From Swiss-Prot:
This is Large ribosomal subunit protein bL36. Keywords: Ribonucleoprotein, Ribosomal protein. PROSITE patterns: RIBOSOMAL_L36 (PS00828). Belongs to the bacterial ribosomal protein bL36 family. Pfam families: Ribosomal_L36. GO terms for biological process: translation.
Length: 38
């Protein structure tokens, strides 16, 4: 999980979601692409 000031999709499998008021990126193809804003 990367914590970044700005989260962007890294590939076509990345999805931007909002959990508990935090913007996150989840990726089914590559788990390294997981990101959280903060």
């Amino acid at each position: 999980m990367k914590v970044r000031p700005s989260v962007k999709p890294m590939c076509e499998h990345c999805k931007i979601i909002k959990r508990h008021g935090r913007v996150m990126v989840i990726c089914s193809a590559n788990p390294k692409h997981k990101q959280r804003q903060g």
